[in-house]
Amino acid sequence: MPEFLTVVSWPFLILLSFQIGVAAGAPQPWHCAPCTAERLGLCPPVPASCPEISRPAGCGCCPTCALPMGAACGVATARCAQGLSCRALPGEPRPLHALTRGQGACVPEPAAPATSTLFSSQHEEAKAAVVSADELSESPEMTEEQLLDSFHLMAPSREDQPILWNAISTYSSMRAREIADLKKWKEPCQRELYKVLERLAAAQQKAGDEIYKFYLPNCNKNGFYHSKQCETSLDGEAGLCWCVYPWSGKKIPGSLETRGDPNCHQYFNVHN
């Protein structure tokens, strides 16, 4: 496994992409890998019966059939049809957790004033969706899971939100506020998370570098590792997943790397 240019945690980076609306200034954003003629040539045809063809979600290249009103949707599914956006169901206690598992629904986009610009609407949604910088500074033990649970808005289908848009800016802002002081983060996954972000911040300063794969540790609310760790790439290829020990983050011997679900529970049934 490459040292850090391997994986990105979908929920955490989606959160970071919106946090920047309330954080400090941003460096140059990273973009998805370009769709080459070769990759486009491998795309399956969209059914002729499809009423609306939409752009692929994430960093994919193949057009898809837009999801209709009421259809199940999520971070990695096809986009909702025009005029709809993917939202967690009312009363859902963990909205983003549900969206990352395709348990949202395509619903009408909320009406916006005619004078509202794309930037201002994103900014207002960001402020409403995430914990403010002041709240973060007063809660140095705030975890990834707590942050994710505070996030409940997804970009409307007409908007194209880069996965890693200004993610490092949020880290830089947190560093400035001493939120990410490694001495304050005692648990292993939390410490590795911010070390990786620091390396990514340094890598982004190198002009001309095009980085399409990243790794961010997937931490639980206690600062340890989720047993399932996955990669997400910006080149449209499905990422690998693997299993680790929650207390150390080290890969479980004999466990496989797969582009699907590695079923990590099976290894704990054996080892416990």
Swiss-Prot record:
One of its GO terms (cellular component) is extracellular space. Disulfide bonds join 32-59, 35-61, 43-62, 50-65, 73-86, 80-106, 189-219, 230-241, 243-264. One of its GO terms (biological process) is positive regulation of cell growth. InterPro entries: Growth_fac_rcpt_cys_sf (IPR009030), IGFBP-like (IPR000867), IGFBP1 (IPR022322), IGFBP_1-6_chordata (IPR022321), Insulin_GF-bd_Cys-rich_CS (IPR017891), Thyroglobulin_1 (IPR000716), Thyroglobulin_1_sf (IPR036857). Residues 186-264 form the Thyroglobulin type-1 domain. The modification Phosphoserine is found at residues 139, 157, 169, 255. Residues 28-109 form the IGFBP N-terminal domain. Pfam families: IGFBP (PF00219), Thyroglobulin_1 (PF00086). It is found in: Secreted. A motif (Cell attachment site) lies at residues 259-261. Binds equally well IGF1 and IGF2. Interacts with integrin ITGA5:ITGB1. Interacts with VHL; this interaction inhibits HIF1A degradation. Multifunctional protein that plays a critical role in regulating the availability of IGFs such as IGF1 and IGF2 to their receptors and thereby regulates IGF-mediated cellular processes including cell migration, proliferation, differentiation or apoptosis in a cell-type specific manner. Also plays a positive role in cell migration by interacting with integrin ITGA5:ITGB1 through its RGD motif. Mechanistically, binding to integrins leads to activation of focal adhesion kinase/PTK2 and stimulation of the mitogen-activated protein kinase (MAPK) pathway. This is Insulin-like growth factor-binding protein 1.
